[in-house]
């Protein structure tokens, strides 16, 4: 019988920790939150000082029964949920259910799930931190009041199924405001003039761009002026000035949650939701050949750039051994966190610097490997010396017309030997330019003009939206991914490639919010509220006082809005699909499981269609296209476009790669250790998981 009971959130985490602690410890999972506010009602007693009415979550009965049974048999119970507000609240709820004293040393926390760290934490239990619990309760109650009080008004005035939220409504407003800027933008014509100068001994010409006249800046706004400049320039370009300077490029800080999400979006094409899903797997533990199950990275919800001394020391030793002493800074790099950062946890880094991405690759699926490699290389880069660059700027005179060319040469790569940051724009690095001296003469192969128009501001991507939300102090590391998922699921925003584009519904709801609940969509108000919630976490503000202060004015706004908002009818967006029953052009509708096509002549014509999403994978039975479908209950599956003539169907997503063993169709499956691909051909049995095992065996 186990003497000690350890309770965590997830089965994956339980499995990893259980292997570290040995037979005296029993590790069980609560499967997330066990108590919460009810979905069917407000769940907050406004009349009695905003007391939350918690209930045991549906479906947790069997899990809790098992936990109670194990708790009765244990001599000691440790609550080892995640080291953040949500984790602290889960521990508090578990303590309540198990009738434990929250002030007793029952809470253990660790920033990484490795053997040494977990064993150490068991020796250092503490009481539940009620400041963290209160901060979580305040956020939960505040979000419930905003959502459950405003959403019914939107249902009555716009349509059912809509929602408002303290962070989501601000995010939608920001996206709508940017779209309005784009719509209002008036492009201005301008012309670029580029001289391509012949370089002796090189096939590649040196490009110099027109700057102005006699060294003074001149913008070209019409073709006639461009033609006049080209005619005047001729083909002889004399070097009038050469400026060379050295500059340093500092290494980027190690990842916070926000910067990890941004960089994974830019460099890997991951959504914020996928990034957090994969990061959670890496944090909770993966089976690594020769090492057993272990956590690969530190805790993933953090706004800190701080690094533990021992981790920094290990990184510097690795850099010295791998790249040489020139890549080790004279003083270890220390990064300053942004204003308002909580700094409760370290930055996101590898748990063991000795486990390189290449060594871990055979044990990880493709997405896990890509994200681990990104985190690993970013961390190593953050501890390396700065890159040394030489920039050269050359001015040319062509009969009074001034042209300029600039280039950059790497003198010492520093941190760029392992890592370069992703970019939101497509601007290219300036290439090095040949050595030139004053009065050198170049001949122009040609001088070209190009008509351009000024561009509106870019739409937000997930990366740039997360960056802005963090800069403005809106939300916290744990809220960015679910916020973006929610505004897309509600139909307020849609993805177009990587861009976030507001729908007409998003514009309508934002207009209502701005006219009636201006504080809720005001960036400063929302950021100030975040600061107040942080004060609760620091024990400097009673949580109910913060809610009380907010609710008084909010209640008056609700009463006024209910009376003043008029019913809004949003015309349906017309598709290019014709209804085969009556010939009308079908329209897009939003249902509980997402968008679908419907005939506009309802109820006379009740034809509906699912929106076809192609997979670019051919059906193994008939060669038709496999498309994404949804069941009547909203569950995603994959079927042949020729249904009902073809019966092919799969709950798992088909992948483009053929089975290397038999050439059959492969599908992507999810297992305890993450995702893997498997062949569905009868009798084959090939999986990428199996191929990794084969590889391990051959290495042994």
Language model: regions and residue ranges:
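Short helix-coil junctions and helix-kink-helix linkers
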Residues: 259-272, 466-476
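Metal- or metallocofactor-binding catalytic centers and their adjacent structured scaffolds
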Residues: 217-253
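Short, conserved phosphate-binding/catalytic loop or strand-edge motifs used
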Residues: 111-116, 257-258, 278-285, 291-301, ...
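Intrinsically disordered, low-complexity regulatory segments
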Residues: 1-140, 211-212, 220-224, 423, ...
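C-terminal or mid-to-C-terminal helical accessory/interaction module adjacent to the motor/catalytic core
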Residues: 113-195, 245
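Alpha-helical scaffold elements adjacent to nucleotide-binding pockets in ATP/GTP-utilizing enzyme cores
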Residues: 16-20, 66, 89-97, 117-121, ...
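Core structural elements
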Residues: 139-149, 167, 197, 247-259, ...
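Basic, low-complexity terminal or inter-domain segments flanking catalytic cores
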Residues: 2-5, 16, 25, 151, ...
């Amino acid at each position: 019988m186990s003497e000690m009971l350890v309770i965590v959130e997830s089965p994956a985490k339980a499995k990893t920790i259980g292997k570290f602690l040995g037979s005296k410890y029993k590790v069980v999972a609560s499967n997330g939150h066990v108590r919460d506010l009810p979905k069917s009602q407000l769940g907050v007693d406004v009349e009695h000082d905003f007391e939350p009415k918690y209930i045991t979550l549906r479906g947790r009965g069997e899990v809790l029964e098992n936990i109670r049974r194990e708790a009765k048999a244990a001599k000691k119970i440790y609550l080892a949920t995640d080291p953040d507000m949500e984790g602290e609240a889960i521990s508090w709820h578990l303590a309540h259910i198990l009738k434990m004293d929250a002030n007793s040393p029952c809470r253990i926390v660790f920033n990484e799930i490795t053997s040494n760290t977990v064993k150490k934490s068991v020796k250092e239990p503490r009481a539940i931190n009620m400041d963290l619990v209160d901060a979580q309760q305040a956020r939960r109650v505040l979000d419930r009041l905003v959502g459950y009080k405003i959403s019914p008004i939107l249902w009555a005035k716009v349509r059912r199924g809509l929602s408002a939220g303290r962070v989501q409504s601000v995010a939608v407003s920001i996206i709508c405001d940017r779209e309005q800027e784009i719509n209002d933008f008036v492009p201005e014509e301008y012309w670029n003039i580029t001289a391509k100068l012949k370089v002796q001994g090189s096939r590649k010409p040196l490009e110099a761009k027109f700057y102005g006249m006699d060294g003074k800046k001149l913008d070209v706004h019409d073709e006639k002026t461009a033609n006049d400049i080209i005619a005047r320039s001729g083909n002889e370009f004399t070097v009038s000035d050469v400026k060379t300077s050295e500059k340093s490029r500092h290494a980027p800080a190690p990842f916070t949650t926000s910067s990890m999400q941004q960089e994974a979006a830019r460099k890997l094409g991951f959504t914020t939701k996928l990034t957090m899903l994969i990061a959670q797997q890496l944090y909770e533990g993966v089976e690594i050949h020769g090492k057993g199950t272990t956590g690969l990275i530190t805790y993933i919800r953090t706004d800190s750039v701080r690094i533990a001394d021992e981790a920094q020391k290990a990184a510097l030793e690795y850099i010295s051994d791998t790249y040489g002493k020139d890549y080790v800074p004279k003083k270890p790099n220390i990064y300053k966190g942004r204003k308002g950062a909580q700094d409760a946890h370290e930055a996101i880094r590898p748990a063991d610097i000795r486990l390189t991405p290449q060594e871990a690759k055979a044990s990880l699926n493709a997405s896990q490997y890509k994200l681990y490699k990104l985190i690993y290389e970013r961390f190593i880069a953050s501890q390396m010396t700065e890159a040394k660059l030489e920039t050269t700027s050359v001015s040319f005179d062509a009969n009074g017309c001034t042209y300029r060319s600039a280039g950059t040469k790497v003198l010492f790569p520093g941190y760029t030997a392992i890592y370069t940051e992703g970019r939101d724009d497509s601007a290219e690095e300036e290439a090095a330019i040949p050595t030139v001296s004053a009065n050198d003469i170049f001949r122009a192969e040609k001088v070209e003009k190009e008509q351009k128009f000024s561009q509106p501001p870019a739409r937000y991507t997930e990366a740039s939206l997360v960056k802005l939300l963090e800069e403005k102090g809106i939300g916290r590391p744990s809220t960015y991914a679910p916020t973006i998922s929610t505004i897309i699921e509600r139909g307020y925003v849609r993805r177009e490639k990587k861009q976030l584009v507001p729908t007409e519904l998003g514009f309508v709801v934002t207009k209502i919010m701005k006219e009636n609940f201006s504080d809720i969509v005001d960036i400063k108000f929302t950021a100030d509220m975040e600061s107040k919630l942080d004060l609760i976490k620091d024990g400097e503000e009673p949580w109910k006082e913060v809610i009380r202060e907010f609710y008084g004015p909010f209640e008056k706004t609700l009463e006024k809005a209910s009376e003043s908002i008029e019913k809004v009818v949003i015309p349906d967006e017309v598709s290019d699909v014709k209804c085969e029953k009556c010939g009308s052009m079908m329209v897009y509708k939003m249902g509980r499981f997402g968008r679908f096509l419907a005939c506009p002549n309802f109820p006379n014509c009740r034809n509906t269609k699912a929106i076809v999403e192609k997979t670019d994978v051919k059906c193994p039975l008939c060669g038709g296209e496999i498309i994404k479908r949804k069941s009547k209950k909203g569950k995603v599956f994959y079927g042949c476009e020729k249904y009902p003539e073809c019966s092919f169907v799969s709950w798992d997503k088909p992948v483009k790669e053929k089975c290397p063993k038999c050439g059959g169709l492969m599908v992507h499956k999810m297992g305890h250790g993450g995702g893997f691909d498997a062949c569905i051909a009868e009798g084959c049995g090939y999986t990428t998981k199996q191929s990794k095992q084969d590889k391990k065996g051959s290495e042994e």
